[in-house]
């Protein structure tokens, strides 16, 4: 058996390969750290007060806007305070995005990919009113209308994007207690999420209807300032991200084709680890596929959901691969039967599959519904917020437990290797040099696997927390830097690229020795070559199981020979 490239590649060639891959890894970090802007940006938009047009109040094709020709009649804060009813049912809160800068009209770019809106509410209670403070879990009913227009359209040509009457629950605290009124400020509430930022301008009209028979919004005093925080992906980061995907995609596809071609040239069926490497490469290829280019010409509101699905498939495959990878190198083979998923790893992989399916169901329950109603959010109710927070915490804990279990498996691998190294002194010098070289290479690869797993788990936990921090309104601020994102993404590609090369079958043919004098001469040649950097870790004559892809996995069944 010729073994793998990891076993047969010379020390100098292996050093060049590892050095080149490490250089690529550094470049991925530098690309995000020096060239790319922060991944996401946000703008705070203070709502404008426009007087309601009662004749067209129920017309969903009519919108009030605060800038441009034909803008609404705006109401000042003083007018609201002087009115005994605080202009109830006569005010529309208007948010026009994006804001102008230095008297220049700005527009959104499709490179910014998506848009998320969260709302900060402030309201007050008069000292003379019967209700002095908001009740716990105060429910707010909001009539939301989201519209859009594009460059070149007239100022009044707003078109309906989505409309809904939604409920939000507020948790408020007193911000200022005065003689005439008490001002309350509330936690941020999720308002909308757009999976595609396809249009140039967006407009949001918010109404807070008061209805006594329906007991609608009667427990509020009167609204003060409403601040909308619009969060979007930075276009410059999208440029860098797509450039990285575009560069990596053909390399991974090419190395997969090369790897599978070498496997099929062998006179045996592919081993389990070779199948897992192919599946892992396929999942990475699906993740690398730069589908985001399509969103520059086609409106794809499902892009966020599709991105989550692609990343989820990759995570599931990567986590499964690491379990099989460590398990196949535990050097404990109870039988000569070929390893299969069903026979050896179904318990471990079942936990990974159940966890990934649970996260998929959680994701589809929110972003799937948002394809039809962008105002929907699982975080809008107290129960939903607790469930969502529990899922995030559970996902983080599960990722940490998985990493600890992987560390345990790899430690068992190292322990088994250490136990078997005690048999090396009884071997011939040639065989001892052969296996010592393999062990050093293998340990380096396993440590690289642990580092990759640690960064992957860290990135997953930070990503979950960063996504939820705008929704749970915690004081913890998490900013995933561009260098970390591009570095980890490049690391996945480089790591899998290296595995496909190093675990590809080596086609070097070594002569089989039949006589003791020939064997002695061969061993002397290997010992002599060990002093140079160009030592080739060839497979010594043995009765290895032909189904194994690495001679290291058959180490336990080797007998010392002189």
Swiss-Prot record:
- One Pfam family name is WLS_GOLD
Molecular function GO labels:
Wnt-protein binding
Q: How does it sit in the membrane?
A: Multi-pass membrane protein
| Topology feature Lumenal, residues | 35-239, 292-311, 366-386, 463-482
Keyword Transmembrane helix present in the record's keywords: the answer is yes
> Is Ribonucleoprotein given among the entry's keywords?
no
Q: Where is this region: Disordered?
A: 538-562
Write out the GO biological process terms. compound eye morphogenesis; cuticle pattern formation; Golgi to plasma membrane protein transport; imaginal disc-derived leg morphogenesis; imaginal disc-derived wing margin morphogenesis; intracellular protein transport; positive regulation of protein secretion; positive regulation of Wnt protein secretion
Q: How does it assemble?
A: Interacts with wg; in the Golgi. Interacts with Vps35, a component of the retromer complex; wls stability is regulated by Vps35.
Could you say which protein family the record assigns here? Belongs to the wntless family.
The family database entries (PANTHER family) matched by this protein are listed as:
INTEGRAL MEMBRANE PROTEIN GPR177, PROTEIN WNTLESS HOMOLOG
Report what the protein is called.
Protein wntless
Question: Origin organism of this chain?
Answer: Drosophila persimilis
